[in-house]
């Protein structure tokens, strides 16, 4: 884990002037244990930007649709309303994506270790109409994959 101790902040309630303004994180455990898709994100005091790339580090889990979420933590601290597509947040999205790219590169997460995942990040980075349509198709495919075992399962007999 990169960073430095925040013990003094906990003790004093004050941040040093040179304290980082954003934290980058990555959730690698695609659909493991509690079914969260693989994603990466950036959190500031005011916002949380998340990109779900929907791939595991192996072929054992099905692909989920790539997509973006943005939460205004001042107005929505419980992260209930995704404002990524709200026009009033367009400049926030642009700024946070720049910060996300900078943080990734600063810690050496350039995507070269998992090129399949990085290809998805790059393909869906701008999330235009074509990317959204492809994500929707991936969503339909994921649903079909998840429903197939249930449809093939033997039906329970009705009691007499």
PLM features: what roles do these ranges have?
Residues 39-69:
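Low-complexity, glycine/alanine/valine/leucine- and proline-rich hydrophobic stretches
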Residues 23, 50, 157-160:
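Residue-level detector of intrinsically disordered/flexible regions characterized by low predicted structural confidence
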């Amino acid at each position: 884990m990169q960073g430095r101790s925040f013990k003094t902040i906990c003790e004093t309630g004050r941040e040093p002037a040179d304290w980082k303004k954003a934290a980058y994180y990555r959730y690698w455990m695609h659909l493991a244990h509690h079914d969260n898709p693989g994603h990466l994100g950036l959190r500031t005091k005011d916002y949380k930007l998340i990109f779900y790339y929907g791939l595991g580090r192996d072929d054992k889990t099905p692909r989920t649709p790539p997509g973006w979420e943005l939460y205004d933590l001042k107005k929505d601290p419980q992260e209930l309303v995704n404002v990524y597509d709200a026009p009033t947040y367009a400049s926030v999205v642009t700024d946070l994506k720049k910060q996300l790219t900078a943080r990734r590169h600063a810690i050496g997460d350039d995507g070269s270790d998992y090129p399949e995942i990085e290809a998805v990040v790059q393909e869906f980075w701008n999330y235009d109409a074509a990317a959204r349509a492809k994500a929707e198709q991936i969503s339909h495919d994921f649903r079909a994959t998840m429903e197939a075992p249930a449809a093939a399962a033997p039906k329970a007999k009705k009691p007499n």
